[in-house]
Amino acid sequence: MEQFECINVEEAHQKLHQQTAVLVDIRDPQSYAMGHTPGAFHLTNDTLGAFMRDHDFDTAVMVMCYHGNSSKGAAQYLLQQGFDKVYSVDGGFDAWHRHFPAEVAHGTF
């Protein structure tokens, strides 16, 4: 995959539950703590190294932000770092929360 692919929250939900991709959330720590997708890895400048050590480059990665804009830049960056399959989640956490309100975790873990 030379370019990331945009997917909707339904596709992201399916990939997450089928465990065919991991989800990273790039929002600020306060927004992440107030609510995030269960199982999402909070990807920041400080956690990037750990994420890259813990995941093989052939791991499919879905990137989520607030509304689906910032995730595109982060998705492109992950491709440049060597990840093979990267997706940007259209609509971001805002769309996830609207479509799957019962699937929102709170806190930093």
Swiss-Prot record:
The reaction(s) this protein catalyses: thiosulfate + hydrogen cyanide = thiocyanate + sulfite + 2 H(+); thiosulfate + [thioredoxin]-dithiol = [thioredoxin]-disulfide + hydrogen sulfide + sulfite + 2 H(+)
Residue spans crossing the bilayer: none
A cellular component annotation (GO) from this entry: cytoplasm
Stretches assigned to the Rhodanese domain: 17-105
GO biological process: glycerol metabolic process
Disulfide-bond pairs as recorded: none
Reported function: Transferase that catalyzes the transfer of sulfur from thiosulfate to thiophilic acceptors such as cyanide or dithiols. May function in a CysM-independent thiosulfate assimilation pathway by catalyzing the conversion of thiosulfate to sulfite, which can then be used for L-cysteine biosynthesis.
Active site: 65 (cysteine persulfide intermediate)
Protein name per the record: Thiosulfate sulfurtransferase GlpE
Gene that this sequence comes from: glpE
Taxonomic path: Bacteria, Pseudomonadati, Pseudomonadota, Gammaproteobacteria, Enterobacterales
The species this protein was found in: Klebsiella pneumoniae (strain 342)
Keywords annotated in UniProt: Cytoplasm, Transferase
Subcellular location: Cytoplasm
Annotated EC: 2.8.1.1
Similarity comment text for this entry: Belongs to the GlpE family.
SMART domains: RHOD
CDD domains recorded: GlpE_ST (cd01444)
One function term, GO molecular function aspect: thiosulfate-cyanide sulfurtransferase activity
Pfam families hit by this protein: Rhodanese
